[in-house]
Amino acid sequence: RPSFNLTDDEKELRKDIVVEALKYKGVGYLYGGSSPFGFDCSGFVQFVYEKFGINLPRTVKEMEKKGTWVKRQDLIAGDLVIFHNPRHVGIYASKGRFVHASTSRGVVRDKLDSEYYQKRFVGGKNIISSLSF
C-alpha cells in the first residue's frame, strides 16, 4: 500500500490528522474522556478524526468494524492501530510510531515495535481511503 498511490488530498489529510494528534501530547489520561481536559484511547482518536469531519464510533470494538484492515508493513500516516489484551487504539504517525492516549502517561508517541505493543498489535484500519476525494 505505497503512499505514492494516494491522491494529494488524501496525503494532505493524513498528514494533517497526525499533526493534529501531536498537538495534544502531554494531555492526561481520563477514563471516558474525549476532550483536551483528558482522553481515553478511543475518545482521543474520535476527537482527532472529528476535527476533520470524520465520525468514528466511541469504542475500540466499534472502530474495528470500520474501514479496511491493513498489515503492519502497509501502515501509512493516519491509519488506526488496533491492539487487544487490553483493547486499545491509536493513530499511526510514521516510521513505526503512533500517537495514543496511554492510561499511565496520557497522550504520547510510542514505537509499535516496543515489546508491549508488538505483542498486542492486531492490525491497522484504513478509515481514510474509503472517503471520497
Task: Give the ranges of each region predicted by the language model.
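Catalytic cysteine-centered active-site loop
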Residues: 23, 27-77, 129
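Extracytoplasmic/secreted envelope proteins and their assembly/folding machinery
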Residues: 14-18, 22, 42-46, 121
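Aromatic- and glycine-rich peptidoglycan recognition patches
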Residues: 2-12, 54, 60-62, 69-70, ...
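Long, low-complexity, intrinsically disordered polar/charged segments
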Residues: 1-29
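Structural motif
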Residues: 78-79, 96
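Short, surface-exposed beta-edge/turn micro-motifs
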Residues: 77-78, 87-89
